[in-house]
A protein has these predicted regions:
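A substrate-engagement module of RecA-like helicase motors
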Residues: 178, 185, 246-361, 369, ...
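Signature of the SF2 helicase/ATPase Hel1-core->accessory helical subdomain module
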Residues: 234, 261, 341-360, 365-502, ...
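Conserved pre-motif I regulatory segment
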Residues: 173-223
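Metal-dependent nuclease catalytic cores that hydrolyze phosphodiester bonds in DNA/RNA
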Residues: 1-78, 82, 108
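Conserved helicase motor "Helicase C" RecA-like lobe of SF1/SF2 P-loop NTPases
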Residues: 656-681
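Conserved RecA-like P-loop NTPase helicase motor core
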Residues: 620-631, 682-793
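A contiguous, basic/glycine-rich beta-loop/short-helix subdomain that forms a polymer-engagement track
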Residues: 336-361, 371-378, 506-623, 631-634, ...
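Mg2+/Mn2+-dependent nuclease catalytic core
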Residues: 57-154
């Protein structure tokens, strides 16, 4: 008899949820502090009240064994001696509209818990109580119903019989999938050099899973240079492991849409090579990008009265799933949009619901790591998941951003202005919070006056609005670090967070009472900003610092996560294994440290391409340090000219900043007008990016030199194979800009391990260098030249970070020597 594991809440909601998607503001997140409210009510219930009681049972229905699990909010015995199952729900529904039958799912959940508990305790009957906590009034409304054990059993059996066809569908698919994956063959005639080694490492990690030594799951770092075929080298072995029962679902997590497409292409290749392959995949895309019915401003309008795809969604979704799951399929963005139109359902929610029935889920990092938007249906508890994390060199910065939060004083000032004249609880709360941040701004300027090297014209308010005899009413703690109107504190500033928390309740009340107000969107944005900063405060620990920055009349409050290691570690622990891979993961000690994988195995694979295909040169007589940049402009221009004049074709030059890029481009265009150039603008959408890259045509009639920024959208994740790109120059070692935040990061890691400069500057910089250089050689047939421009590339601190396939680098003395060696390279 087949066995199906089924969370009780999932059973109830799947069968009984009806109606529409409705994302109108209800303030429900204020109640979700729901967990806090639950604990508050549970504590108030007294000593005889058992809170969060774990219940599980095996029940048979339709020749299937169901393993049901869940947690009852509370179980107690009342004054009559009757056992009561308490189901607590927080709600923003007005008290007069809270009725006994307003949500059948609530009773159903309590009744299932009751059926399990009554059977285990041999109780002939018990009570189920619904406790509604109304978040606006703090009112508690309760409803009680008595059930016999027989009635509860009949109810549970009925639910299981209704779910049985869906369970049978899952069982049959799992058998078919396992058989199919066990016979899966590598889709190419042979492995590329290094590809089998990478596949073997990932296969072993997936098989190992959680062990006594790896309770958070097996972790693997794999540095695989361009050309190995990382995507297939990761997916194929993970799927083979799944076919052997090692992993229930595979999550392929990426930093960019381009790598999501690579994963889709790899899966399509497997389907093409093995047409009967039983494998379903879904690609999750941001709601804003897949919405079929946006509002006038282009934003999703997830309201039943505005969107036909939201209206009645839960009434139609099971029919849509039934039709879509009858075959094998790859549900990418286009397929989801087509299915959504066909069944008149929201494509974003359809993707989420399909993910529960798919074997491979492709999506952004945030679906696992972001504390707000992660997939709660999977990751609120651990599961038999396999994680493949592509472009893992991006994860440290992305993770820091996910766990940090930022709030601007101006949003309070603008909200007060938007509300107009008159008194209200909201305006009072906004005024208090605004005043607190104003005083913090004064204290910030006093603690960290702007240096004279900064122009007063750029920030006149630093002096004109703060007379010398001004004494801020708010006194900040002794700062960790203070410079140029930026102050870092170890502890979160309660004097600022408390008034911001006090804004939430009246702001919520206003939003609920004024859904059609012209400024509703503005105040809703403020609500979410306050919510973000207060949520970050709840996570705040020794891995965070507080940053206060005064700019003119503005004060920015940031709760900065300097070290995301414990949070990334906790996220990865939700699965059985995690393989993190990239072309640049050196040194491994750095990534182990910042990603919380101290015991992870790390492997570095050699490049599969012949070394002679890459001409690698360095002119170490040029300094591109910030203080030397103006003096270096002509030398850099001349070196770029020698690079591109050696052979007609497409080239890129990558710079550490837009300002330096523009300086050199202006000089280059003036002195070498015969060479066509393209300049990367600071903000390009997907269409503009594609248009830019389309200029890099195969075998061009004239030379093209693109000017781009290291670490930007062209510095990595771009595949210009063959003659679409035959060379690039890397101008500088890519160090992040020196600023107070980066300096705080350096100080933090200096205190942690003594490698502050490496962690904050050198390692991230060289990562960008290696990523940019990796754009040139994409296939075994490619030939190309890479030119490094900076004297630091000749220093041991940087040479030790070079990959093995850079051993043949040549250091040159002049542009004339560069021209000569390039001529030799291209003539071979």
């Amino acid at each position: 008899m087949a066995t199906v594991h089924l969370p009780i809440r999932q059973l109830v909601e799947f069968l009984l949820r009806t109606g529409s998607i409705d994302s109108r503001f209800t303030g429900f997140d204020r109640a979700l502090e729901g967990a806090h409210i639950h604990r508050k009510l549970q504590k108030a219930a007294g000593d005889g009240y058992q809170a969060e009681v774990f219940l599980s049972v095996e029940r048979q229905a339709e020749d299937i064994t169901f393993t049901l699990e869940g947690r009852a909010d509370g179980i107690f015995t009342d004054e009559t001696g009757t056992v009561v199952i308490d189901e607590i729900k927080t709600t923003a529904v007005p008290p007069e509209e809270i009725t006994e039958d307003m949500n059948p799912c609530h009773w159903a959940q309590g009744m299932v818990y009751g059926a399990i508990y009554a059977a285990q305790q041999s109780l002939p009957e018990l009570n189920v109580r619904l406790t509604y906590y109304q978040i606006d009034t703090d009112q508690i409304i309760r409803f009680i119903r008595r059930f016999t054990q027989q009635k509860l059993d009949e109810f549970l059996d009925k639910l299981l019989c209704q779910y049985a066809p869906w369970a049978q569908r899952r069982i049959e698919w799992d058998v078919k999938r396992t058989q199919s994956l066990s016979a899966l063959q590598f889709p190419f005639a042979q492995y590329r050099p290094g590809q089998r080694a990478m596949a073997g490492e990932i296969y072993r990690a997936c098989r190992a899973g959680k062990t006594a030594d790896c309770k958070g799951g097996t972790r693997l770092f794999c540095q695989a240079p361009t050309g190995i075929g990382k995507t297939m080298s990761a997916l194929f072995p993970a799927l083979k492991a799944m076919g052997e029962g090692n992993g229930e679902k595979l999550f392929y997590l990426t930093a960019r849409n381009t790598t999501q497409t690579a994963a889709e292409d790899a899966l399509n290749r497997l389907h093409t090579a093995q047409p009967k392959l039983a494998l379903r995949s879904v690609t999750l895309t941001a709601k804003e990008k897949v919405c079929l019915h946006p509002d006038a401003e282009g934003h999703p309008a997830c309201l039943p009265e505005l969107c036909p795809y939201a209206n009645g969604y839960y009434d139609r979704i099971k029919d849509a799933l039934t039709a879509l799951l009858d075959g094998t399929g790859s549900f990418d963005r286009a397929a989801l949009a087509g299915a959504a139109k066909r069944f008149s359902v929201c494509p974003f929610e359809l993707g989420l619901d399909l993910s529960e029935w798919c074997d491979v889920v492709i999506g952004d990092y945030n679906y696992l790591f972001d504390p707000v938007v992660h997939l709660k249906r999977f990751f609120d508890s651990s599961g038999d998941w396999l994680f493949l994390v592509d472009e893992a060199h991006n994860l440290p910065d992305r993770a820091r951003a996910m766990y940090s939060a930022r709030f601007c004083k101006s949003s309070l000032t603008e909200a007060k202005r938007a509300l107009g004249k008159g008194k209200s609880a909201l305006k009072t709360a906004l005024t208090k919070a605004d005043k607190a941040l104003l005083e913090a701004r004064k204290a910030c300027i006093q603690l960290a006056p702007r240096h004279s090297s900064q122009t007063d014209a750029a920030d006149p308010a630093q002096t004109s609005l703060l007379p010398e005899n001004t004494v801020p009413a708010l006194e900040l703690p002794e700062p960790l670090y203070a410079q140029d109107s930026t102050v870092f504190l170890q502890e979160p500033p309660s004097a600022l967070l408390s008034p911001l928390r006090a804004v939430q309740a009246p702001l919520q009340d206003w939003l609920e009472a004024n859904p059609d107000a012209e400024v509703h969107a503005q105040l809703l944005e403020l609500y979410f900003a306050v919510q973000d900063i207060t949520r970050a405060a709840e996570r705040y620990d020794s891995h965070f610092v507080t940053q206060l920055t005064a700019r003119g009349r503005e004060l920015e409050l940031q709760l900065l996560c300097l070290d995301p290691a414990p949070f990334v570690d906790a996220s990865l622990a939700a699965g059985r294994s995690a393989a993190l891979f990239s072309a640049t993961l050196a040194p491994p000690s750095f990534y182990r440290s910042v990603l919380g994988c101290s015991d992870a195995r790390a492997v570095a694979l050699d490049s599969p391409f012949p070394a002679e295909n890459l001409g690698l040169y360095c002119l170490p007589n040029i300094s591109t340090r910030y203080r030397d940049r103006e003096a270096s402009v002509q030398a850099v221009s001349d070196a770029l000219a020698r690079l591109v004049q050696a052979r007609a074709g497409n080239y890129f030059a990558f710079f550490p900043s837009y300002a330096y890029l523009r300086q050199v481009h202006e000089d280059f265009a003036a002195r070498y007008p015969g060479i066509r150039t393209l300049v990367q603008e600071s903000r390009l959408d997907d269409a503009a990016r594609a248009e830019f890259l389309a200029q890099f045509v195969p075998d061009p009639a004239e030379t093209l030199l693109g000017f781009g920024v290291m670490g930007g959208i062209f510095g990595e994740g771009v595949d210009l194979a063959g003659s679409r790109l035959i060379g690039c120059a890397i101008v500088g070692v890519g160090l992040p800009q020196v600023n107070p935040q980066q300096e705080m990061l350096r100080r933090y890691y200096d205190a942690q391990n003594g490698f502050g400069f490496d962690y904050a500057y050198r390692y991230p910089g060289m990562n960008k260098v290696l990523q940019a250089a990796g754009r040139v050689i994409r296939t075994p047939e490619d030939r190309g030249a890479v030119l490094l421009l900076d004297d630091r590339f000749a220093q041991q601190e940087y040479i030790r970070l070079f990959p093995p396939h850079w051993r043949h680098i040549r250091y040159l003395r002049s542009c004339e020597e560069l021209a000569a060696v390039l001529q030799d390279f291209w003539n071979k």
